[in-house]
Amino acid sequence: MRVAVLGAGYAGLTLVKRLEDALPDDEVVVVDEDGTHLVQHELHRVVRRPSLVDDITLDLGDVLDRATVREATVTDVDPDAGIATLETPEGAETLDYDAAAVCLGAATNFYDLPGVEDHATPLKRIGHAHAVRAEFFTAVEGATAADPARVVVGGAGLSGVQVAGELAALAREETDPDAVEVVLLEQLGSVAPSFPENFQRAVRDELETQGVTVRTGTAVASADAGGLDLANGERLAYDQFVWTGGIRGPPAMDGERPVVRNTLRLGEATFVVGDAGRVVDTDGQAVPASAQAAVRQARVAADNIERLLDHRRDGGNGFEPRLDGYRFDSPGWLVSVGDGAVAQVGPTVLTGRAAKLAKTSVGAGYLSSVGAVANAVDLVREELGWPDEESGEPGADGRSGGDGSDDGGEGPVRVTIDDGDDSD
């Protein structure tokens, strides 16, 4: 039998690796536009450190054992017929399957706000990160403390928080920080509005410590080449505009994120996993779009696909097998803010060195879990400033090694959570 995994983000890659083990006699096909996996929750780092691209981009052929990788764009999915339509360099093709999972992630939602899509840069792909970096240097050229450049980030979910923090850090590193104003806008009453209040407060404090101007209760109504019209009637000029204001479904789903119940089942043998759908868990709660949710949903989907195919192999007689339900239970949240970080583990909020160690641990742990151990080591070295074993050169924060105790910070923290509010 053939199982198709459409997309290779957090959900797709986790699912494929589990299916390779669970279904050794079945064909597993993963469809991805360019045959790579992007560690999305580290993408903002590329804005400041382009060298990280190699650490957070994985060739699927290097981390998969036997699955077939098809480089194509999924343009349509018929969940009842069991057919996916693909666009390849040779033209349109169809892919029939016995079971499938739609793991296509989400696209940036511009909400049809006039001019926003035309004038803002999103942050979903490597090319976007490079564009944000290039636009930053164009924006700040010639800026002075008396006449500063204004960089506006629209949307203060975790993605917006991270890119705003990174741009503020870039300003400190590459120019006079007084010559750049980084402004983070959020239409709701707090940053990270989907998260607990103590986490929100800590994130806002960290942003302001890093020099970011935070404006909550401020909605964008429209944009043009020179500025934003805000919903309150104010005109806000900008030199650079980045948009992280929300997500929508992938084009293959007509921009929709279908609602699925906790079994993640969309059709007879088609499942939706990760940000491509709106999942209602076993407690009846809507699941937030996040990397950790996508990974955990993939585990449930893998078990359910295995049960359905085993049932068919046994003749398909009698009742269908009982499928597992997904329950969202987050052990905590993490977000980077420039060189700092904020972590929430249970009711406890961590900042400073402990939070950064937790954040780096999560990123490296995820890379190791999908078989990219060398990438994990490189990421830790880059993030924590450990020296390169061959050159002895310090990493990004200039440290030359040591046991991590020289700054009075806490030791390594192991936290099995992911950050990010749009995971792909």
What are the residue ranges of the model-derived segments?
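Beta1-alpha1 glycine-rich phosphate/pyrophosphate-binding loop at the start
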Residues: 1-70, 162-195, 400
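Conserved acidic residues
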Residues: 2, 98, 239
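Catalytic nucleophile loop
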Residues: 9-12, 157-160, 294, 301-302
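C-terminal, flexible cofactor-proximal segment of oxidoreductases
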Residues: 23, 297, 302-424
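A Rossmann-like FAD-binding core segment of flavoenzymes
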Residues: 25, 69-80, 95, 172-262
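FAD-binding core/adjacent interface of flavoenzyme oxidoreductases
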Residues: 67-149, 242
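FAD-site-proximal beta/loop scaffold in flavoenzymes
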Residues: 118-147, 226-227, 235-307
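Rossmann-like NAD(P)H-binding beta-loop-alpha module
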Residues: 132-182
